[in-house]
């Protein structure tokens, strides 16, 4: 009995335990409430779009503009990726010279051994970037035949940053090379999986989710649809004369339009508005002004397209460029206005993802829209 009596707690002890439990519960509830409020206050943005549209570049811009950019160690880690871009670019161009129809010969036959060297190192994954490699790349890039093949890059699969890095081969080859922010923005690395970037603008928290755009990556998107404030859909406008990597047949811009339509009409996303980034405006302008690839050859309806009266061109913009960019904008708006249910809206913006000032201005313009979507999301509007 004595032992039992000693092990049992007095009413006073039990009261103390109960009080401690209540205090602990109160602290937990307070923390949970704090987390709920923080979650509700966060704007979650989902970046969607077809492969190579510029989604990851937008994320990099958010880091440059709103996080602290890239530290020296991160820049150092990107050197190998940038040099790999150089290798991929020159291998692709040199290999395409004999496969495109009609084929393109080297302008200087003395460069043949350089071309053979580049083709021989193509399959090597763990490649050492020697001075010999960079010298061959530089000489080949100066060859007018290689340049002529590059000009026909819509006929094969070439990364967008090819010209940018090939023109900067002298700096990229330096032993003490340090990539600039622009180099990091241009660097192409395939996005696989889901990447989250967190940043704050004027004390407002943003979580941006970047998902791979290639067809086999899209099944992962559904994981990100829960509680999204807005979708930022990125479309590469300059891709009107290109085909996708996945099948080497489907027009890239058509693929982007079809994907946009499937997202717009997705029953799980009927109340989520889309901010449309009509990207790669710089490359679109270059193609249109070069006049080699006519939009009407790929989109016959362009022949009868008239620019809307309310269209506002950029200062000094060529009318041909204005017509092209608004035509592509209207292809997307035709999809978003077809339903007309008033449950979600499409807000188009012309962007150049590698231009930091352009993205700063566009994102600032979007913040009011995102705020309204956020208030609507939690029925505060």
UniProtKB/Swiss-Prot annotation:
It catalyses: GTP + H2O = GDP + phosphate + H(+). The modification Phosphothreonine is found at residue 178. Residues 41-381 form the G-alpha domain. The gene is Gnal. It is an enzyme of class 3 (hydrolase). This is Guanine nucleotide-binding protein G(olf) subunit alpha. Residues 1-25 are annotated as: Disordered. Keywords: Cell membrane, GTP-binding, Hydrolase, Lipoprotein, Magnesium, Membrane, Metal-binding, Nucleotide-binding, Palmitate, Phosphoprotein, Transducer. Mg(2+) binds at residues 56, 191, 210.
């Amino acid at each position: 009995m004595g032992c039992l009596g000693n092990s049992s707690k007095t009413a006073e002890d039990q009261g103390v335990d109960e009080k401690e439990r209540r205090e602990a519960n109160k602290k937990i509830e307070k923390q949970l409430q704090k987390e709920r409020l923080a979650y509700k206050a966060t704007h979650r943005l989902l970046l969607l779009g077809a492969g190579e549209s510029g989604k990851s570049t937008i994320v990099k811009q958010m880091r440059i503009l709103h996080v602290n950019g890239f530290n020296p160690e991160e820049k150092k880690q990107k050197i190998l990726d940038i040099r790999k871009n150089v290798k991929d670019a020159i291998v692709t161009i040199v290999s395409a010279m004999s496969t495109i129809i009609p084929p393109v010969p080297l302008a200087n036959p003395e460069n043949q051994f350089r071309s053979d060297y580049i083709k021989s190192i193509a399959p090597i994954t763990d490649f050492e970037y020697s001075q010999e490699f960079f010298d061959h790349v530089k000489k080949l890039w100066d060859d007018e035949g290689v340049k002529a093949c590059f000009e026909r890059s819509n006929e094969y699969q070439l990364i967008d940053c090819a010209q940018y890095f090939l023109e900067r081969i002298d700096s990229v080859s330096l032993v003490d090379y340090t990539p600039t922010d622009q180099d990091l923005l241009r660097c192409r690395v395939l996005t696989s999986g889901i990447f989250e970037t967190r940043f704050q603008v004027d004390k407002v928290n943003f979580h941006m989710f970047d998902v791979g755009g290639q067809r086999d990556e899209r099944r992962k998107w559904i994981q990100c649809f829960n509680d999204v404030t807005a979708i930022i859909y990125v479309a590469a406008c300059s891709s009107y004369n290109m085909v996708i990597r996945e099948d080497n047949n489907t027009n890239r811009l058509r693929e982007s339009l079809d994907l946009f339509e499937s997202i717009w009409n997705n029953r799980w996303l009927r109340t989520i508005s889309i901010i449309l980034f009509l990207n790669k405006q710089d490359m679109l302008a270059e193609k249109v002004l070069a006049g080699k690839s006519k939009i009407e050859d790929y989109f016959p309806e362009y022949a009868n397209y008239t620019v809307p009266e309310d269209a506002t061109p950029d200062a000094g913009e060529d009318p041909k460029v204005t017509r092209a960019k608004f035509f592509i904008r209207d292809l997307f708006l035709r999809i978003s206005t077809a339903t007309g249910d008033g449950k979600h809206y499409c807000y188009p913006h012309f962007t150049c993802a590698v231009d930091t000032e352009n993205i700063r201005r566009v994102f600032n313009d979007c913040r009011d829209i995102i705020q309204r979507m956020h208030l609507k999301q939690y029925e505060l509007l």
